[in-house]
């Protein structure tokens, strides 16, 4: 039971980061954006995190076109 609770808390933390990013960047709360930010929060996809960090550093935000390109490049094949 403890392991299940730990997994619940760990995954809820990822979910909170994902929703926090969507809120702070004023993005639409659609499944694609949630998936992008959830994977970002886990740190399991280093290339995705790198391109997001670079784009945010360069532009200060992610456009819908950026999000679509990120999804198509780094997540649509999963």
Annotate each predicted stretch with a short phrase.
Residues 1-78:
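Extended alpha-helical signaling linkers and dimerization cores
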């Amino acid at each position: 039971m403890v392991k299940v609770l730990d997994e619940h808390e760990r995954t809820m933390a990822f979910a909170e980061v994902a929703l926090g990013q969507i809120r702070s960047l004023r993005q639409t709360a659609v499944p694609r954006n949630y998936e992008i930010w959830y994977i970002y929060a886990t740190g399991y996809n280093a290339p995705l995190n790198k391109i997001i960090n670079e784009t945010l550093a360069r532009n200060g935000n992610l456009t819908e076109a950026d999000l679509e390109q990120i999804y198509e490049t780094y997540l649509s094949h999963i």
